[in-house]
Amino acid sequence: MHERLSDRHVLLLTDYDGTLADIAPTPAEATLSESVRLELATLAAFDDVTVGVVSGRRLDDVLDRVGPAAEYGAGLHGLEMVGPESAFHHYALDSVESVIARLARDAARELQWCPGVLLENKKYALTCHVRLAPPELGDRALEEFEALAEPQLEARTLKLLTGKQALELLPAVDWHKGRAAEWIRARVVPRVDRPVSIVYLGDDRTDEDAFTALGDEDVVIGVGDRPHTHLIDWRLAGPPSVGRFFARLADYRRGAAEET
């Protein structure tokens, strides 16, 4: 990997939940460890490294959690993005806001029978989490959640994403983390003096869209036991291993800078 990156500017893009932070019982409890935060900040300080976070969370939420190390951010799987002097808000978001609000009310009413169900209203997307529900009830709750949105799914107003013990509804547009990675790279390239290689870290099926969008000059790192794809160059066990990887990458970039 170091040979592949030796003469290139590194654009480090990473998912949040399950990659930077351990999966938690609720989204609010998923916090960045101080060790990972420190290593990420160390990398961001290098002139030849740019850091971005690409997440299914709302943009403001994930940027608040990662802090100033992330120069670029993509929320809602890339439907909203921001960087220095640039921002992106997909046109489809505003068209589904009222639909999501109505489905959130319907789901809260219809799924109240199931203990442990958590509905996460992201304004432009709605996620049903069943991590805290009894397994035999959680699967049924997810089926009912999907059924509530069937008219919008059939009309292609919304699409359904499958997560870890969760289902998510969001605008049915051809936009994903792969598009987000391309958008960010296109804005980094004019700002640096050498070719750009993306190092992308992700743990979920939605990250496969980014893996597919990357080229031979890029590095794909899977985190945890998912996703299962031949596109992965290396695999790390979890967020603690991600922190150690950041430390090794920083050591390499520091050594390369001293040699020049």
Q: Where are these predicted regions, by residue range?
A:
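Mg2+-dependent phosphoryl-transfer enzymes with acidic/Ser/Thr/Gly-rich catalytic loops
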Residues: 7, 180-260
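Non-catalytic pre-domain segments flanking phosphatase-related domains
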Residues: 1-16, 20-24, 35, 186-190, ...
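Conserved Rossmann-like nucleotide-cofactor binding loop
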Residues: 19, 59, 206
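A general structural motif
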Residues: 7-9, 48, 70, 123, ...
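Conserved acidic, metal-coordinating active-site core of Asp-based
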Residues: 106, 120-200, 205-214, 218
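Active-site phosphate-binding/coordination module
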Residues: 31-122
